[in-house]
Design a protein with these regions (language model features):
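N-terminal, motif-rich segments that launch catalysis or mediate targeting to/interaction with membranes
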Residues: 17-148, 162-258, 262-296
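Bacterial N-terminal signal peptides
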Residues: 7-15
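Catalytic glutamate of the conserved HExxH
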Residues: 148, 152, 156-158
Length: 296
């Protein structure tokens, strides 16, 4: 079953997409820098598969373009009335309690990101555990689940994945989602200073995602204010607008990207440690196929 899943997901990775979360450039930047922070016990493995892992970190965005119902897994809409005021304690962190309180339909409508991050953290931990049992396709599963988990962790650091005003539609900032997460990074990538802190192992991906989303939510208003100031008096979002916008939000953008790098590395390390710190092979331990010699 895992082999079939791996093949299916690999095909989807190659599918073209117009949708994005942090933006493909940002997700891949974060993933590359996160690999650099991994400890020596596992860094050689991730370096060996660096190109594949960096490429696959955008897969969850690509899945949505081929009909997978994955949208709710990329956000959590803080700000909706039913969750109360910041820090939104009306929303239980335990999934079963949240479903019981709000119902699955409403919960899904407002986003499932922390629980998806936890699910993929578990998938990665189990993939690491397979190394200790010499399970076929353990290597392939880690190369698959590490970037998939990383994607959802990274989304929690994008402020507009943490608010019901996710595209500035409530405040006259329509389109801000892409301008902040994609356009700024693509235009100014070479000028960004990414300075991640040394990672600490993440032991609870759900709570880590919740905490990151709460921090993201508090950055929404300053970004919206900067957007309005940068576009004031203009009829279009020209180069001058983007330069002004970047100058105003650069500290926020650099900080969230840096923190996403640290969290990505911390989640990978945490999953590996919970799996018992197995030694990682760069080849799958597939069973030997024994063929009977033909009768003479």
């Amino acid at each position: 079953m895992r082999r079939i899943l791996l093949v299916a997901l690999t095909l989807l990775v190659a599918w073209p997409s117009t949708a994005s979360a942090w933006g493909f450039t940002a997700h891949r930047l974060i993933m590359r820098r996160a690999i650099d922070l991994l400890p020596p016990e596992i860094k050689p493995f991730f370096d060996h598969f660096r190109e594949q892992i960096v490429d696959r970190v955008t897969s969850p965005d690509e899945w949505r373009t081929v009909g997978w119902d994955d949208d709710p897994n990329h956000f959590l809409d803080f700000g909706v009335p039913e969750y109360g005021k910041y820090p939104f304690s009306e929303l239980p962190r335990e999934y079963g309690a949240a479903v019981e309180k709000f119902g699955l339909v409403a919960l899904k409508r407002n986003g499932l990101l922390p629980w998806r991050a936890a699910e993929e953290f578990g998938n990665l931990r189990r993939a690491f555990e397979e190394f200790a049992r010499t399970t076929p396709y353990a290597t392939s599963n880690v190369v698959l689940f590490a970037p998939v988990m990383a994607h959802y962790i990274q989304d929690a650091y994008q402020p507009f994945h943490a608010t019901d005003n996710y595209d500035g539609q409530q405040t006259g900032n329509t389109g801000i989602h892409a301008r902040f997460e994609r356009d700024l990074v693509e235009r100014f990538e070479t000028k960004l200073t990414i300075a991640p802190a040394p990672p600490k192992p993440i032991t609870n991906a759900r709570d880590a995602a919740f905490d990151a989303l709460l921090a993201s939510y508090q950055l929404v208003d300053p970004i919206l204010k900067a957007d309005k100031e940068a576009v004031a008096g203009k009829e279009r979002y020209d180069d001058d607008y983007f330069q002004k916008f970047f100058d105003k939000v650069r500290p926020i953008l650099e900080r969230r990207l840096s923190e996403a790098v640290t969290a990505t590395a911390g989640a990978i390390i945490g999953a590996w440690q919970q799996a018992g710190r197995p030694a990682l092979r760069t080849e799958d331990a597939r069973p030997v196929q024994r063929v009977r010699p033909a009768r003479q």
